[in-house]
């Protein structure tokens, strides 16, 4: 079987899920191709704009999603859908040139382009969408994939309410790499991380981009720490956040 995984650079979570599926499929002897939507240049441009808006003007990002959510439905498409559909021609040529048997996408934008191709009668290859959010973000309801992998069953009601067909929803979780299945002794892990073996440790994570007011949360945690308690913060690729934490 020849499989295409289609992602986009708006945070590493989507790409990580795609790579995890790719790793599992390769172990089972499947041929895989991992592609960024629109190619590296377009993907990085879209991803860069997305990340800049989310990091620096989150209120504007929230407004865009709220307005889009009001417009979007299973029968009415949003401006986001039509913007993504501009990549349909390029993707159609790529799919036809490589004759894929199956397409998987961990990203909404790619799912919208594939939906556009399907509705134009240009796509007969089955499409599986992989959700990486623990909520139903706007615009999934305007996609038309053959199958949706959902992070957990508690999301089913929300997704169905938005208009996604129940028979296409499968709560199988978010794919992760094989490395997460490797069990290690806690004492060795603590030693590797240079943490006391008997201490209480609070882990703070906010995605690959280091979202949110993490520095304020950490400052409050540190203020209330006991003598045998530590805070470990995963900053992702947010160097500014790391610098702020190192100086506090």
Describe the function of each predicted region.
Residues 26-30, 119-124, 163-164, 223-228, ...:
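Short helix-capping segments at alpha-helix termini
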Residues 1-4:
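Extreme N-terminal starter segment of soluble prokaryotic enzymes
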Residues 6-8, 35-37, 130, 204-205, ...:
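Short hydrophobic segments within beta-strands
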Residues 12, 67-163, 168-171:
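Active-site and donor-binding regions of nucleotide-sugar-utilizing enzymes
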Residues 146-201, 205-209, 237-241:
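A nucleotide-sugar donor-handling region in carbohydrate enzymes
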Residues 7-19, 212:
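A short, glycine/small-residue-rich beta-strand->loop->alpha-helix junction that serves as a flexible
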Residues 196-248:
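Donor-nucleotide binding loops and adjacent catalytic segments primarily
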Residues 20-97:
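Conserved N-terminal ligand/cofactor-binding loop architecture of enzyme catalytic domains
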